[in-house]
């Protein structure tokens, strides 16, 4: 027997019949339809909104709203992209001091991190506290070197 569209049937157990509530007690979901006796949750419409505690002051309003939580052990960096390093000449050493002298970083408050945005056209010796993977790859591809400095 060949299967055609009019003879196709779904697998047994793959489809479940919808419960028809309120159609007599023999159906199993008649009378109160599985909602119990009386009360707000047996009425029509959504019973209560999420987080409702029956009129009691809810938890999200009892807990104080504290502001200005600082991240513990947050690492801040003075960042610079590779495209800015093209201002240097070949075989120059790039570090936080040389970037301040060139005017590329104004206030060296934090350790230096090199980001990989842009293209590097010069061969440089870069000394920084952190590099992104892309930045390190691009510096080495340009013939330069990356030196990690420990910030203590």
Curated annotation (Swiss-Prot):
PROSITE patterns: RIBOSOMAL_L15
UniProt GO BP: translation
Record's compositionally biased regions (Basic residues): 14-23
Pfam families (UniProt xref): Ribosomal_L27A
Species for this entry: Prochlorococcus marinus (strain MIT 9301)
GO cellular component, one term: cytosolic large ribosomal subunit
Protein name (record): Large ribosomal subunit protein uL15
Main function: Binds to the 23S rRNA.
Compositional bias per record (Gly residues), positions renumbered to this chain: 25-37
Gene name linked to the record: rplO
Family: Belongs to the universal ribosomal protein uL15 family.
